[in-house]
Regions:
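Fe(II)/2-oxoglutarate oxygenase catalytic core
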Residues: 1-150, 221-260
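Short histidine-centered beta-strand/loop micro-motifs
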Residues: 125-127, 146-153, 172-174, 200-202
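Short, conserved beta-strand element in jelly-roll/cupin
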Residues: 139-141, 152-168
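A short hydrophobic beta-strand segment most commonly corresponding to one strand
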Residues: 158-162, 190, 205-220
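A short beta-strand-loop-beta hairpin characteristic of the jelly-roll/cupin
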Residues: 164-185
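Conserved metal-binding segment of the jelly-roll/cupin
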Residues: 181-196
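Ligand-binding loop in jelly-roll beta-barrel domains
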Residues: 195-209
Length: 260
C-alpha cells in the first residue's frame, strides 16, 4: 500500500464515523422504541402527569409529615450525607459540586436494610407503592444547579414528594420539557424523565424531596416485560457500585457514632 493510502487512512475521523454509523442510528431506534412504549401507556408521551392518576399518591401525601420527621432526624444525626456522584459517578456529567446529596432506600430490586431501619415509616410507605423501582432522599444545597439532562428508560415515571421547600418557592424549580414546575411541601409531582429537565435552587435553604421511580402503566404483557428489564438493571455494575458505596458509608457512619 502506498504512503498516500496510509495517509488517507490516518486522516479518517473515526469518532465521526462511529457517530454516523452507530451512535446516531442507535439513537433513532431508541427514540422510536420510546415513542412506541409511550403509545401503549394511558398517559402517552406527556412530560408531566397528573398525580391524581395514582391512588397511592393521596396516602403518601397524607403521610408526608411522618416522612419529614424521619428525614429531619437523619439530617440531624448525619451532617454529611454522601454526594450522589460518590454513589453514581455518571452523575458527574450533571454536577461536579458537593451540593447534591442522597440517601438511598431501594435500587432496582435491592432494598437497603440500613436505610429502612433508620427511617422505618418511610420504608413501609415505599413498600406500599406498586411497581417501585428506585427511591432516595434527594437533597439540593443552596445555589445548586443540575444541568439539563434526560433519563434513559421510558418504562418508569419519576416522582418527587416535596419534604423541605425553601422560600421563595419560585426560586427553587424544575423545568421539564417546556413546563416549569415548583415543588410544594407534602405534594407529589410525577413526570417522564426521558424528557429533558433541569433543576435550580436559587434560595438560601436546602430543598429535599423523596425521589422515586415507579413502573409506567402499560398493558399486562408489556408490564411483565418492563419488570423483567428493570430486574436485569439490578445486576448492572453501576447498581452494585451504588449499593456497595452506600453500605460502606453506613458502616463508616455507624463506626463514628459508636467508637470503641
Amino acid at each position: 500500500m502506498s504512503q498516500s493510502a496510509f495517509g488517507s487512512a490516518a486522516r479518517i475521523n473515526w469518532k465521526e464515523l462511529y457517530k454516523r454509523a452507530i451512535k446516531l442510528p442507535s439513537k433513532r431506534v431508541g427514540h422510536a422504541i420510546e415513542d412506541w412504549v409511550a403509545s401503549q401507556s394511558p398517559m402517552g408521551n406527556s412530560p408531566v402527569i397528573d398525580a391524581k392518576t395514582f391512588d397511592w399518591v393521596e396516602r403518601l401525601e397524607k403521610s408526608s409529615d411522618v416522612i419529614r420527621q424521619e428525614l429531619l432526624a437523619l439530617l440531624d444525626a448525619q451532617k454529611h450525607l454522601p454526594n450522589i456522584q460518590e454513589l453514581s459517578p455518571r452523575q458527574m456529567n450533571l454536577s461536579r459540586e458537593d451540593g447534591w446529596k442522597s440517601y438511598f432506600f431501594y435500587v432496582l430490586g435491592h432494598r437497603i436494610d440500613a436505610s429502612y431501619r433508620r427511617c422505618p415509616e418511610t420504608g413501609k410507605l415505599l413498600d406500599s407503592i406498586p411497581g417501585l423501582a428506585l427511591a432516595f432522599f434527594s437533597v439540593l444545597a443552596p445555589g445548586m444547579h443540575i444541568k439539563r439532562h434526560r433519563g434513559s428508560y421510558k418504562g418508569v415515571l419519576r416522582c418527587h414528594l416535596g419534604l423541605i421547600v425553601p422560600e421563595p418557592r419560585t426560586s427553587v424549580r424544575m423545568q421539564v420539557a417546556d413546563k416549569m414546575i415548583y415543588w410544594e411541601e407534602g405534594k407529589c409531582i410525577i413526570f417522564d424523565d426521558t424528557h429533558k429537565h433541569e433543576v435550580w435552587n436559587d434560595t438560601d435553604g436546602i430543598r429535599v424531596v423523596l425521589l422515586f421511580d415507579v413502573c409506567r402503566p402499560l398493558p399486562r404483557w408489556l408490564t411483565a416485560v418492563n419488570k423483567f428489564v428493570l430486574s436485569l438493571g439490578g445486576y448492572l455494575p453501576e447498581a452494585h457500585r451504588l449499593l456497595r458505596t452506600q453500605r460502606e458509608w453506613e458502616a463508616r457512619s455507624a463506626a463514628l457514632a459508636n467508637p470503641l
